[in-house]
Amino acid sequence: MSNPQSGTIGCHCGICEITVADKRAVQYFRCGCEDCRQGIEWGSSRKITKPNICTVKPDQLPHVYYIPADIISIKGKEFMSAYKLREDGRSIRLYCKQCWSLIAVEHPAYQSNVFYILPKHCVTSCDLSVPLTAILFMKDYPEDYETPPEDDVPLFYSFEYKQERQRFSSLPTVANTFKRRTDPLKGINFTELVNSLGEPEILNLERGKRFL
């Protein structure tokens, strides 16, 4: 296997950027969950209040790419801020406070091994050529949206039932992606970056609310 090359993930205004030791995405989902949608829409709605900032129309079914969590440099940390959508939320979202780009997202289930990015809502040089693994959380997909894509991949309505969770865990790349890292880091993991910013701000977003 060739030596990993570094890649960057930053904001649209260019003030914030992280560099990862390995730019190759290891997992790709499309996600219909409410949290992904609200996190994207909330950031995009903040941009609308600033006419000089370019806004992008969110995808109805976001493209979610997982990147190995080994960060070797950070630019503009003072302009980064961490948020949770609700008090009981588990995911932490990292935004640029100047342009409200959504830089990256982490969740305890990732065990600090990976974090995910939404490439339409950040600027990245990472290699996103990994094939689509699955379509997730279609339970939350709004009825007024377009018919979801018909990619020949597993589709999960929710993870409410044990059978669905087991079927998801049995996918070949999933177990590798969401396991604790054993190789030494060249830098710091995403959890360390988020923790260094202090307690995440709780947004208390109303469930079901649309922001765009």
Give the role of each language-model region.
Residues 2-9, 16-212:
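A short Gly-Trp-Pro
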